[in-house]
Amino acid sequence: MERNLQKQLYGISRESSPGARRYSMPAASADSTRKSIFGGSASCAQMSGSLKRTALTNSRLSLSVRSTQSIAGIRSDYNSVESFGCPLPVVVNEALTFAGPGAGTVTAKVTQNGWAWVVQGRRLLIWQYKDTAKSGSPPRVGKLARRGGGLAQCRELTLPYSDLGHKSDLISVFQTEGQQMASCIAVSATGEVRYWSSIAHDGNSVDLSILTGQEFVQLLSLPTQQGYLAVTTTCNLVFLRVGLTNGRYTLHHKTIKPATSFLGGFGKKFASILIGMNTGADKDQTLVGMCCESNLESGETIVAVLSDRAIQRWSLSNNGNTENLLYEDADMLRRIREEFITNFWKFRLPADSLEIDLHLLDFHVVKNKAYILAGAVNAAHAPQMCYALVTGTAQAERMLLESFTPLNMNKFFSAKTEEDCLSVRFVVGSSHIYLYTSKVVYPLHLTNSVPTAELEAEKIEFHQHDDRILSAVICSQLPLFFSRTHGLVSITPGDFDGTEMMNMSSCNTPDLYAPNSCNASFAVADHSALTNSTNNLHLFELDPDEMYNELSDEVGQLKAAFLYHMKRNSNMVKTIVDELLRNVTAADPSGAPMDAYKLDRIVITIAEDLAEDIPIADPRWEEALADQEMNRHAIGSSRSMQIINQLRDKIIAFQHFITFLHSSLVWDKLNVIPCGSHSLKPTGCILADISEKIVAAMALRSIQTKLPKLIEEAIDATVALWHEEPQGSLTYQDIFYVKLSRFQNVFEALADIADDRIAAQNQTTISVAHFVNEINSIVLDVLGQVFKYRKQHASSFRLSHEKLPSYENLPWTAMAGSAGVRDTLTRLIDISVRYGSHCVSETELKQQLYQQIFELIDLVLDGRKTYLKSVRDTEKFNVLQQQFEAQRRELISVLIKDRQYEYAAKIAEKYLDFQSLVLICDETQDKERLEDYTRKYEEYDFSQFAINWHLRQNRHGEVFERFKGNQTALAQFMRDHPSLGWIQLIFNGDFERAAKVLYELAQCETEFVARKKSMLSLAKLAAFAAAESDLTAQVEKINADLTLVEYQSQLGHDVLESFGFDPAEQKVLKAEEIISLYIAEENETASETEFRKALELLSYVEQPYDMRHKIWCAAIKRDNWTDYDPNNAVHYMQKLLFYKIIEISQLMGNDSENVLPPMEDFLESVELGDLPQQKPFQYLLKLTYEYVADMFKQPDDMEL
């Protein structure tokens, strides 16, 4: 791939080889090619003067040696295509590879919440491809995404009947908090709606018919409104909501009134004129797509609907009851049409003769920015469809077109190829837009949320004949594509490595340190230290004129401007900076694409050099350096021989450099740097990380005199880990306090030392606990100074308000892996608990360890919470929030298990872990504390959380005991859980109402017969307890229902299993179903007793006459009525099941007229086939009836 195309696709330079700096900088300056604050291989940072490597490097291997082909049948030269998640369920594979009629109508969808489904005819196959509760963090997603060996469990549902078939876009699968099994709602194209409260039970569904005569094409979930929005091909909207009435789910719908703007009603005739369409005045508008644009603080949701006529923006209230059309903008489409003409045909044909056909293909809204994929054909010029990506933002009264990006992927357009030309779709990721057809994916790079793909992108081809892409989604910033042949696959640029981000000191995931203003003040700096250190700083001795003349590259020029700033020569500063800004924004003379991050790379290069510059006056370093000239222009060097003074000089020089960036207005031009293939890190945050590592080094050096042996051992282990060896008279400490790029590794070394000391002990002793205490104190002291510095100097690294919402905030102290400290902190917590606090009895030491554990937990959670706040409006927020909540609960539980309730409560209160707070109140039996939390966290609905917690613990009774003083909370709880309202009635002594509520709940119960029996039994008890009321009639109804339940319980397990029922957890069966199971052919052991029970159940059937006939026919078919000895007909008859049923009925005192149907019913029965026409059957049947008539005669009526 050519370099300009590489830059176009990935927004980075690939000009340097592994180990070299990837800044596209000239190497004229020796000091600009020396070392990196972001680490890398030690072999790339030796004192031999080899080029250094930075975190802006996006791979350890060049593209020429990196394999990107992962799956046979998918061709990609520069991207890695890997299988994602578990293998597809077998039944899904069978549906996808189905080759019969209708195979081409199979559709599929993959969603961000981890669920996927396939639609084949009326079959809906649902499975969970990713467990969002256990997914890994995004930096590790490259490793976690690889396919495991287990199969995902698939659920099959039956869709409602539809003449127009079913589409996967009209289905939504979701799982709410506390719900064990997902729910599903489906809308057919003809408007038949079906809702399943649990996808595990196909038969338990609710149906509704809406807006007949229309064709529905898309279903949109509205979480705020707890509903759904269905849209037809003509942009008619229907709001759907699932309700719960008396414990039974119901569906409700509301048709959104159509727009009455100038494009609605009679104004439709003018729409085509206004936007230039030649499609006929009477043609209805056609839907392109519908998106949930934003959720406002008021609870309202903004929905955007794009058609081929206009774009509508609707506002829906938080309860979905009211809607408001904000506006309908047709001018947006006119502007898109004009952009096509301007960019593709303006210079080829006279503008007056241009008539183009505009096609809007796909529509998405991401972070309040609208993305539209459009195509246009100028038939008069050439039968070719041209494509473009359009971005826009919503204004108060119209849509603002922000950008129009032509795409060089033209297709031949004809009647035969029209479907293929119009099939292009796209998904929007954090750093790329992925265009795709059924066979090809085009990854296009995003810069500031705008596509920059004017060149043709690389094609990722799914080239197997029977393969095609069925769906695509962005999940946790990872693009996933659902292939008919390969299932779910992920696509990442070929230079991406899931572990690489973890190995880079400050480029893990996008982060954002989020202060409020841009003020370059270092007001809290120690001015006395500044004065005292001035004589040691080498930068005051450097001649700016000499540097300006000698170093002609951009790095050298900006260094010179910095020195002029220190000399207060503002004219030269302005001259150099202006020229530099012109150069970095000018077009490349060779025609290569402009490097959008060039200025950021220059600034970070200088900051890295400053942080790792060696002390210029130390003769030991002169001896170690092969090239003495490479340190001559070092602006971070100190003349001091003491390490602590060298570090202080560096932080002062760094502060001067940041002040220079602000005063020269260079800071306002800084943006971001690509870190890995999917991450953009703000330059201001990278600079903050660099300065904080200098401060951390100062803090460690300051306490080294207190614990010299331990810290020296950790430093030696850290430098050895870097594969560095001191040369000449240099020591490990000299190297460590210069190589600050990987300073965080010293914390890992301290944890390793603790493990080694523990492993060396035969048993845990108090000395180990003291040792762990010392290590914790080092870590906490150092990080305490870092956080203090971060707070004091936040304004110096603050981003502008415009850039603030665009980036994420993940400081190095919160990063996982070797790039940060978070994993080490978690490890120290575990060590402190297992080998510290649990193993000592000394009160003071034990309390010190718990205090340290408390502080370590606070550091871990604070970093994760800060990061979580910065990604609130991104795709990965839900996944990261679940991870945060899981780790929060796990860490606080450590303190709760050890009964450190006060520490646990402080953490839980700070990070709003309500589950831990309720658990603390429960274990301490502190009812007052629970009431205090209810008042304190009223805005978070703490009382409802606490009540639900008790329910999950199966402690229903305690809810009313503990919250009886909070009637408001109980009332709200009863409204949300109507199936438990009877408990409060019991507590209040209202047994009559409790009996009625329980009986109503039992009538609504259709899932588990055991639950229905319990409800009926409780209702009967409540009725008996209502001594003052006469509930005889209700008790009789209850007894009748209990009798029906008892009949069901007597069914054999074999017959239940043969019909697919679970004998252990039986669902509620109707009387007709129970009868059918009693008399079924599969019930081979059924005797006259089972058939008698079936007859007894006729009183529960709406049409008993027909069912009685069915029972007797089933009994007749059990025996042979034609092959018998006529001489012994009576004897043979008495062995028939038919006769035995009559006989047992007679013994039980039943009248034959009520038991037996008329004989003519059997002689004319269709169910018996040709048996009634056979004479032997007729004879034996008539004999039976005659014999039975005599048997049922009363003794007084018999003649002697």
Swiss-Prot record:
Top-rank taxon, per record: Eukaryota
GO BP, sorted A to Z: mRNA export from nucleus; poly(A)+ mRNA export from nucleus; protein import into nucleus; transcription-dependent tethering of RNA polymerase II gene DNA at nuclear periphery
Chain residue ranges for the region called Disordered: 1-28
Compartmental location: Nucleus, Nuclear pore complex
Keywords for this protein: mRNA transport, Nuclear pore complex, Nucleus, Protein transport, Translocation, Transport
UniProt family annotation: Belongs to the nucleoporin Nup133 family.
Description of how the protein assembles with itself and partners: Forms part of the Nup107-Nup160 subcomplex in the nuclear pore.
UniProt protein name: Nuclear pore complex protein Nup133
Lineage of the organism: Eukaryota, Metazoa, Ecdysozoa, Arthropoda, Hexapoda
